[in-house]
């Protein structure tokens, strides 16, 4: 696997290494890679290996995007592990990993604000309501990344389901011929969704954070998920979670109206000073 300090040297390499432009399979990340990211890269590798005779190239980017953090402390405390990230990416099957700089991504300087994005409930509810401007930053950086990489396929995890839906809408609107490939959530043995933020939880806190997933499953299996979500949120609060939302909405549009077979449970809560999010499909 090759490592590049930015997209310009990576693109120069591609132009010299391939007689025919390869189909690019892209896994954008913010680093602090874990087994869930490994699943994304392995999914891209498997997809590439099934593409037949066309040349392919699996590339991972690692860039901590300052415009999508609504709290400075969250940004400054985000873990950085570049050497370990490169090893994991290589082991999972990446052909290249790119570490773009803030200057490359924002040559005019990091903007104090970015253009607002309005995709209805996709951007205005749940994370969009609790973290105003968050998806503006996500869309800005993903648009920037896609313009630089121009992948045929981009791989994103279902743990950040709402972000996945927003990015799918962005690609549909602005990038013809590009496809988003969802990858299922990887979980720890306890059921806790894998996240780089989990590193900030001590042993017992990390173990007990699994109550979040248990609450989701309880709601999803209920005969009345929307009513059960209220009780589950109260029970999480009694355990010490600071619940921001626990809601049942349509997984495609994020609208609240009940549609059998199309509902999903979403939760965001603080635990041990760390903000955790997760989601599962309703099971009936």
Region spans (language model):
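Nucleotidyltransferase catalytic core that binds NTPs
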Residues: 1-241, 249, 253, 280
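A C-terminal functional module that forms or caps the active site or interfaces directly
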Residues: 232-284
């Amino acid at each position: 696997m090759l490592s590049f300090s930015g997209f310009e040297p990576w693109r120069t390499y591609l132009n010299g290494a391939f007689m025919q432009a390869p189909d690019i399979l892209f896994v954008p990340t913010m680093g602090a890679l874990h087994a869930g990211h490994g699943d994304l890269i392995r999914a891209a590798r498997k997809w590439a290996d099934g593409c037949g005779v066309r040349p392919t190239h699996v590339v991972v980017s690692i860039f901590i995007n300052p415009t999508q953090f609504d709290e400075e402390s969250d940004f400054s405390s985000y873990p950085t592990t570049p050497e370990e990230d490169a090893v994991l990416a290589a082991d999972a099957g990446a052909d290249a990993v790119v570490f773009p700089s803030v200057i490359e991504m924002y040559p005019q300087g990091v903007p104090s604000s970015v253009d607002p994005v309005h995709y209805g409930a996709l951007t205005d509810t749940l994370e969009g309501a609790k973290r105003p401007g968050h998806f503006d930053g996500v869309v800005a950086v993903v648009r920037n990344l896609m313009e630089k990489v121009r992948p045929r396929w981009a791989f994103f995890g279902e743990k950040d389901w709402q972000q996945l839906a927003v990015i799918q809408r962005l690609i549909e609107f602005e990038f013809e011929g590009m496809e988003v490939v969802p990858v299922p959530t990887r979980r720890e043995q306890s059921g806790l969704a894998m996240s780089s933020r989990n590193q900030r939880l001590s042993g017992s806190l990390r173990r007990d954070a699994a109550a979040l997933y248990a609450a989701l499953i309880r709601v999803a299996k209920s005969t009345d998920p929307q009513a059960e979500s209220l009780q589950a949120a109260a029970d999480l609060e009694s355990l010490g979670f600071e619940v921001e939302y626990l809601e049942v909405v349509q997984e495609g549009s994020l609208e609240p109206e009940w549609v059998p077979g199309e509902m999903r449970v979403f939760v965001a809560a603080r635990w041990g000073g760390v903000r955790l999010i997760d989601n599962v499909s309703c099971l009936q």
